[in-house]
Amino acid sequence: MQKKSVALVACSNGYGHIKRLLLLAESLFMAGANPTLFADRSSAELIAKKEQILIPKVINFDTHTNKENWLDSSAAEWVKFAPNLSKFDIVVSDNLVEILLIRPDAWLSGSFFWHDALNFFPHDLKKNSISLLKKYNPKMISSELFTSNQLKTYTKLYEVGLFGRTNFIKKSNNKTDALIACGVGGSVKKEAFEFTKNLANLKEIKYRKVWVEPDIIPLDRPDWMIPATFLPEMYQKILVAIIRPGVGTVTNSLSVGAKIFPFYESDNLEMQFNAKKIFLAGLASKTHSINDAWKASELFFESFDKDNFHEEKIAKINFNGAEEAALIMLNHI
């Protein structure tokens, strides 16, 4: 029987969308399909190598759909120069609603819509997005932990687990390290850099090592502060993750049993939503600034060996979202 062909089209705002589609592509391949990823090739190759994900065929295609593109109304223009997707059995986009203009039968993946996640989103663009969703009522895959209510309103929703990696899922009783990271970061990156500069002046800390995202690590730093690699070997040493709560970094941190201490920019609705969801699930502290996140993490460090509640919450998480999504999609042809 001929393999089903699947086109995967990524939003270009950060690495999370590409990573999710890489994991989905790997699962689709393992399930007998033939996936092709449409994304920035260099980003896809970097993520696949770092996260040890099997890389599919990649067509170098940048949708130019970052935050600034959405706010100036140019993001929806990507459909005008999109490649021909008519020959694919299945088309998936994470998380571009405009894919429905090209393939009305397309799947969406993600946990939110851009028109709900950004402040000052252009009114006409939001109106067009909602109109597309109402017209086509697309099928959508979302990790249950992060599903927003809007997805339930406008799509045929299939909820799955987190898109985890089996090579990350390894517990250890000898965790002594902390991670500080902010991803693309937005306006919070400057705050994070100032914090790490001040942190580097401390003579003693509670952790053995503090892994810091390279973009925000000071040049003049002590031996205990080292650049974060985001490789499995790093994550397996992490007890606490002081992070801007993007779904990808949250997933990797949780998969090794780390507790999340979030910080994020006050005007980012997506980060607010993610932080609230993981707090309500008992997986994170209720913090907003990086200073508060650090202080809360130190209190956790002093008592984590007695914190059976956190271990119990971690044990209940489903990390098989990519495999579940692949089977759902292939069974709906």
Annotate each language-model stretch with its function.
Residues 3-12, 30-73, 288:
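Conserved nucleotide-sugar phosphate-binding/catalytic loop shared by glycosyltransferases and other
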Residues 249-296:
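Catalytic binding pocket for nucleotide-activated donors in carbohydrate/polymer assembly enzymes
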Residues 285, 290-315:
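Conserved donor-nucleotide binding/catalytic region of nucleotide-linked donor-dependent transferases
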Residues 123-140:
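Membrane-proximal helix-turn-helix segments that form the acceptor-binding/catalytic region
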Residues 18-28, 45:
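Short amphipathic alpha-helix
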Residues 298-305, 315-333:
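C-terminal alpha-helical cap of glycosyltransferases
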Residues 7-13, 20, 110-114, 120, ...:
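Active-site donor-nucleotide binding/catalytic segment of nucleotide-sugar enzymes
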Residues 215-255:
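Donor nucleotide-activated moiety binding/catalytic core segment of transferases
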